[in-house]
Design a protein with these regions (language model features):
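Residue-level signature of the transmembrane alpha-helical core
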Residues: 12, 16, 20, 64, ...
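Pore- or pathway-lining transmembrane helices of multi-pass membrane proteins that form conduits
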Residues: 80, 84-109, 118-121, 148, ...
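Transmembrane helix-bundle core of multi-pass membrane transporters
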Residues: 100-161, 191
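Single transmembrane alpha-helix segments in multi-pass membrane proteins
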Residues: 7-56, 64, 68-69, 73-90
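Non-cytoplasmic
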Residues: 27, 31, 35, 198-218, ...
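Interfacial loop-to-helix junctions that mark the boundaries of transmembrane helices
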Residues: 2-10, 61, 86, 134-145
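Helix-loop-helix "hairpin" substructures at the membrane interface of multi-pass membrane proteins
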Residues: 138-214
Length: 231
C-alpha cells in the first residue's frame, strides 16, 4: 500500500513539473502585459523538436538546445505580432495554438512510434534519496524536475524581491510610467515573451523526453490549458 502511494505521489510530481514550466513561462509573459493563449501549441513544438533531434542524434544536450531554440523562435514571432504589430493577443494566441498543433503533427509523423532510446533518466540524490518515503518521492527524479525545485523560488524572488521584478510588474500594470522612466518597453516585452515561450517549450520536452520516451500528436493532452488556467 505504501509503495503504491509513493508511486502515485512520484508520478504526480512528474506530471506537475511539465505544467509548472509552462505556467512559469505564461506568468512572465502575462506579467509583461502579453497574454499567450498558444501555450499548448508551443509545448507541442518543443516536444516534437526535441524528440526528432533525440531520434536522429542520440544527443540529449543537443535535443535540449533545439527545444530552447524552438521556443525562442516561436516567442520571437509571437512578440513581433503582439508587440511590434500590436495585433490582438487572443487572435495571435489562438493562431499560435493552431499553428503549433498542426505543424508538430506534420513534422512528427515520421517519428511517431519510433523509439528514441534517450530520455532524462531518474537520478537518485545521495543521502536525500534515502529519506523514508520523501526520498523516493522527491529525490529520485530527473534533472528537469530537480531544476524546477530551484526555478520556482528563484522566479518568485525575481518577480517580488528584485529591481528587475519591479520593472516587470510595472511593464504589465503601467507600461506608460515605465516608458516615462526611460525604459525600453518594447525590448523588455520581447525578452520576457521569448523567455516565456522557451519555458513552454521545455514543458513540452518534459512530456516527450522525460515523462515518456515517444512522440504522439497531441501528447501534451491539455497541459498547456491547465497551465494557462492556473496563471
Amino acid at each position: 500500500m505504501i509503495a503504491l502511494i509513493i508511486s502515485l505521489c512520484s508520478g504526480a510530481i512528474v506530471y506537475a513539473v511539465s505544467v509548472m514550466y509552462a505556467g512559469i513561462g505564461e506568468t512572465f509573459s502575462e506579467r509583461a502585459g502579453i497574454m499567450n493563449l498558444g501555450v499548448e501549441g508551443v509545448m507541442l513544438m518543443g516536444a516534437v523538436s526535441g524528440y526528432i533531434t533525440a531520434v536522429h542524434t542520440q544527443n540529449l544536450f543537443l535535443s535540449f538546445l533545439v527545444v530552447l531554440l524552438t521556443g525562442a523562435a516561436l516567442g520571437l514571432v509571437f512578440a513581433f505580432l503582439t508587440v511590434t504589430l500590436q495585433s490582438d493577443q487572443t487572435v495571435c494566441g489562438m493562431a499560435m495554438l493552431i499553428f503549433g498543433t498542426g505543424l508538430s503533427g506534420f513534422i512528427g509523423k515520421d517519428v511517431s512510434g519510433v523509439a528514441a532510446n534517450l530520455k532524462f533518466e531518474k537520478i537518485a540524490i545521495p543521502v536525500l534519496s534515502k529519506i523514508p518515503v520523501l526520498g523516493d518521492i522527491f529525490f529520485k527524479q530527473n534533472l528537469l524536475t530537480y531544476a524546477m525545485y530551484f526555478i520556482i523560488p528563484l522566479s518568485m524572488f525575481y518577480i517580488y524581491r528584485t529591481r528587475y521584478g519591479l520593472k516587470l510588474r510595472a511593464l504589465g500594470e503601467n507600461p506608460a510610467a515605465l516608458d516615462a522612466a526611460g525604459e525600453n518597453v518594447f525590448a523588455m516585452r520581447y525578452g520576457y515573451i521569448i523567455f516565456g515561450c522557451m519555458m513552454m517549450s521545455i514543458s513540452g520536452a518534459c512530456v516527450s523526453l522525460a515523462n515518456t520516451n515517444f512522440w504522439n500528436s497531441g501528447m501534451t493532452a491539455g497541459k498547456g490549458w491547465i497551465a494557462f488556467a492556473l496563471v
